[in-house]
Regions:
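Electropositive nucleic-acid engagement tracts
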Residues: 1-16, 21
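Single, function-defining residue in the core of a domain
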Residues: 12-16, 23, 27-30, 41-322
């Protein structure tokens, strides 16, 4: 509720966007007793994370200690908590009939990229006329799978292939006709926002601690970093909202610089300010209080400094003798 009061933009009007993806913790050389005779490094586990890109918040996650379990199975308990009015974005790994049936049971919508071994099609409708978009052209058709279940299949033909060499992408969706095929294709492009969130978790908050070999400890470290990220995202939004009128368009606060500011001053505040000087603030007044405090921050100290594009340097030959 607090971050919504601080203002936010929406990717798809009148819809709550949820991006779901798995985050596998890297293998670690920290050996548990049962693995000390094994050569390979152990994988502590993984988490399936539900991310709200509009609010920049992790909404839910399912932690799994078995690093080799299926993400498709672990996502089902998360889908049980989905609600009508939400649209879930997922990669092709989740293009399975149980995942789509779980969405139908809770009356939530989805946009899932098609994989090679997708559920067998019972019937395919005619393709509609292609419509040009920024990155290529889009067309759609109605498909039917086992059990009489129907959904829309959208094909995006790209002007230039992706890094993996794909020249066309297909998405399955049960969004209503009020959401066009162009909007579905554009919406899926924003699925990569969760990858940026994972990168910030690891680089800024050290969510993947290499010395933790125990699955419980490693997953506790990851979930603690997720909780800290949500708090920093609220602080980031409050700083941006407080200085929006005085800063140029596109100005953003940096979660990294905010984390540095919190880390550098926290111990001193614990010593200088006893607990009675830090009273509890009601939830309904928290957003206003955060804005009051954010106005005291110098924007330059927490401004985001995006790196410009790399300019390729010409390679020249050096004349030499053996």
């Amino acid at each position: 509720p607090t971050i919504k009061e601080l203002g936010c933009t929406t990717m798809l009007p009148d819809w709550q966007v949820r991006v779901v993806d798995g985050n596998h913790l890297a293998s670690t050389e920290k050996r548990l007793g049962a693995l000390r005779q094994e050569r390979g490094a152990a994988r502590p586990g993984f988490s399936v994370v539900v991310y709200d890109p509009d609010l920049d918040q992790v909404i839910d996650l399912q932690a799994c200690e078995d690093a080799y379990a299926s993400e498709r199975v672990c996502v089902l308990p998360l889908l049980a908590n989905a609600e009508p009015g939400q649209v879930w974005l997922a990669d092709r790994l989740y293009c399975t009939l149980p995942v789509m049936e779980a969405c139908e049971q809770v009356q939530t919508s989805f946009v899932i990229r098609q994989q090679a071994k997708h559920p067998r099609l019972i019937q395919e409708g005619e393709w509609q006329e292609s419509v040009p978009v920024e990155t290529g052209s889009v067309r759609e058709q109605i498909i039917q799978v086992r059990g009489g279940y129907q959904c829309r299949r959208v094909e995006l033909t790209l002007h230039s292939p992706t890094d993996s060499g794909d020249s066309s992408l297909m998405f399955w969706s049960n969004l209503p006709e009020s959401v066009s095929a162009q909007q579905i294709a554009e919406l899926y492009r924003r699925r990569w926002s969760i990858e940026g969130m994972f990168q910030r978790l690891e680089a800024i908050l050290e969510s993947e601690i290499e010395t933790l070999g125990s699955p419980k400890a490693a997953l506790l470290g990851f979930t603690t970093a997720v909780l800290a990220y949500n708090v920093l995202a609220v602080l980031k939004r409050s700083v941006e909202q407080a200085h929006r009128e005085t800063q140029p368009d596109g100005w953003e606060a940096s979660i990294y610089h905010l984390a540095v500011q919190v880390r550098s001053g926290y111990e001193g505040m614990q010593i200088a300010l006893p607990s009675e000087y830090l009273p509890a603030i009601p939830v309904e007044k928290l957003a206003q209080r955060l804005l009051e405090l954010a106005r005291n921050i110098q924007p330059k100290q927490v401004a985001k400094s995006p790196r410009g594009p790399k300019v390729p340097k010409p390679k020249t030959w050096v004349q030499g003798k053996a």
